[in-house]
C-alpha cells in the first residue's frame, strides 16, 4: 500500500453543531485531530493557526460547515494539517 505523505480532504463539521453553541470551535478542532489520527495512524497532529482562524472567522460560536485541508507528513507519525487553498 502506498504511503500517504501529502493528502487533501474535506472535513464536514456537521457533528460539531450538536450541543452547546460556545463549544463548537473546540469540537471542530478535536474533530480534525481525530479524523487525521484515524485515517493516517498519527500519534501527533499539528494544526496550523491559519486553519483554526479560518474555521472561526465569524466568531467562536459561528463556525464554517466544511473545510478543505491538506495533510502533510513531517515526521514519524507526525502530521501537519493546513488549510488547502485552490490553485488557479
Swiss-Prot record:
Pfam families: Ribosomal_L31e (PF01198). GO terms for cellular component: ribonucleoprotein complex; ribosome. Gene3D superfamilies: 3.10.440.10. GO terms for molecular function: structural constituent of ribosome. Keywords: Ribonucleoprotein, Ribosomal protein. The keyword Ribonucleoprotein applies. GO terms for biological process: translation. Coiled coil: none annotated. NCBIfam families: PRK01192.1-1 (NF002258). HAMAP family: Ribosomal_eL31. This is Large ribosomal subunit protein eL31. It comes from Sulfurisphaera tokodaii (strain DSM 16993 / JCM 10545 / NBRC 100140 / 7) (Sulfolobus tokodaii).
Amino acid at each position: 500500500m502506498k504511503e500517504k505523505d501529502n493528502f487533501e480532504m474535506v472535513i464536514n463539521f456537521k457533528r460539531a453543531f450538536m450541543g452547546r453553541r460556545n463549544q463548537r470551535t473546540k469540537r471542530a478542532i478535536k474533530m480534525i485531530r481525530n479524523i487525521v489520527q484515524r485515517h493516517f495512524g498519527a500519534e501527533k497532529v499539528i494544526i496550523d493557526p491559519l486553519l483554526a482562524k479560518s474555521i472561526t472567522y465569524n466568531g467562536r460560536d459561528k463556525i464554517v460547515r466544511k473545510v478543505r485541508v491538506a495533510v502533510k507528513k513531517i515526521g514519524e507519525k507526525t502530521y501537519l494539517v493546513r488549510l488547502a487553498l485552490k490553485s488557479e
